[in-house]
C-alpha cells in the first residue's frame, strides 16, 4: 500500500487499509453509482480517515471477524468541494449536510459510511459486491427515505433490523456512534467539532 500524500499526513489522515487490512473498499462517490449519478472522486480515491478513528475501526472489525464478516466502506474523508456539489443536488440538510465555514464529520475525516459483508454463496444480485455478499440492511446506501433512519422499523424487515443492530454494536465497541438519520453513518471522536476546512485530495 503506497503512503498517503504529504497533505493527508499533515492533516492526520491515514488509509483505512492500514488500520483494517481486510476491509472492503467500495467508495460510491468514485463511481456514478451514487445519488448524484456522477463520479465525484477520482477512480483511484482512497478511504482516508483521521488517525483518531483508527483504534475504533480496528476494534469494530475485530467484533465482526469471528462471524466471518468484514467492514465495507462506502465513504470516508470527503473534500469540501464535493460536499458543496452534493448539497447542490439535494439541498435538504435533513439528508445532505449543508457546507459551512468549518469542517465536520466526513469533511474532517472523522465519520465513515459503512456496512458489513460476508462470503455468502447464496446472495441476491443486488447485494453482491465482488466476492462478498452485503448484509440485508433494508435499504441501499444514500436512500433518502424514512426507512434509512438508523432505528427505523416500519418497512424494515426483522432481519434488516437485526443486521443494523449488529453493525451498531460492532461500531460501538470501537467508540463510534451511529447518526440517527442514516443507519450507515458513524461518527468518531470529535466529529462535530468546528475545524478548518481541509484541502486534501482523496487520492
What name fits each language-model region?
Residues 1-74, 88-181, 187-203:
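Extracytoplasmic cell-surface/polysaccharide-interacting catalytic and binding patches
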Residues 79:
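Segments that shape or occlude catalytic/ligand-binding pockets
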Residues 82-83:
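Short, well-ordered surface patches within globular domains
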